[in-house]
Amino acid sequence: MKILFSPIGNTDPWRNDRDGAMLHIVRHYQPDRVVLFFTESIWQGNQHFSGQQAFDWVKIIQSINENCQIEIKCDTIEVENDFDAYKDLFHQYLVEEKRKYPNAEIFLNVTSGTPQMETTLCLEYVTYPDKMRCIQVSTPLKTSNAKTKYAQADCQEVDLEIVNEEESQQPSRCHKIAILSFREAIVRNQIKSLLDNYDYEAALQLVASQKSFRNGKEIRKKLKELIDDIKMHRVFSYLIKQYPRNEKLQKALLHTILLEMRHQRGDIAETLIRVKSIAEYIVEQYIQKNYPYLIIYKEDKPYFNVSYSQELTESYLALMDSRNKKTNKKMTVDSLDRILGFPAYRDFLQLLEASNEMTNEMNKVNEINNLRNKVAHNLDSLNLDRDKNGRKITNAVTAVRTMLLAVFPEVQENDFHYLKQFNQSIKELL
């Protein structure tokens, strides 16, 4: 089904003994339904011009397409020269047409109305282009309408017969205009906003929805690769090239970048759940680097090497006993044979180094551990206002970066901003 939506300004069904724009579209596209829009003042006219009600618009249209359904809409517009005056009204009418006829193709006549009407329709198309087309009609002489002969209401039947006879063999003066430059400008700004929020999947979908888009193929490829890397936790190729011989650094840096990205885009609960595991991995590398052989691995799981230092073993047992005062349960060397995690690493470093940068940063991560367990294991909701939780999570995220730099001081500051640099590269392609 084809529907023509056509606002009518101070124009006539035909001029210079030839079709007017609306009539020309009807002649060459043969729509099943025509919706004409008039302002009340244009419809009724005044002392300076006769209103459009003087013309039999239904008869005029059906003289070309006798089975066409015609609906005339007439509304009072307070400020007719205001470009915003028609925006909501036109949108409402077009939504109604789409709801009544969901499979219809809607043609928008952007030639017959006032400049304000035509501009509004163009913007409507740019914003909601699905199943719509903008149709522009050239004048018969492909020039301005100055000094042309206009239709007269009192002899419209004679004029209509002449026009139909002359126009029946004439080529179409209709042009489908995509207004791609306007549409692309809006889409580019939308993509930039999505990039700023690190919403790469939505950005990819938006780029992919455009049939013709500058650098579209390259942008889609880059976005798809980044999305796959993030989903699969694959180290970015840039980081591999930057640090080709240090896989542990690559992994730690990747996850620190992703952690900060999630925090910046407001994905706070996910940030809270991930921060401890990333900190744990980084601290494990710190211990391996500064205290070799303190950790031994059984089936790739970390365990405390009780043979590392008798003094450390005794100090660690004493620390565990002090925490078990209520149960009076004494810890033994055999009871230390268990998989290690962040709390144990924190204990070791407090015993080995007392107070230093690493243990101070670990305390910031440990401060949110109970909150993390409630969200991750009890599936509790997150309240950022309670107990300064928002600030504590921010401190923990910042601590992870500081810890990473303590273990891998060769990491460059710019590397933490890799995603912002990636975003900028896409914006330049746009």
From Swiss-Prot:
One Gene Ontology term of the molecular function aspect: endonuclease activity
Annotated disulfide bonds: none
Transmembrane segments: none
Top enzyme class: hydrolase
Family per similarity comment: Belongs to the CRISPR-associated Csm6 family.
Assembly, per entry: Homodimer; the composite ssRNase active site is formed at the dimer interface.
Protein name, per record: CRISPR system endoribonuclease Csm6
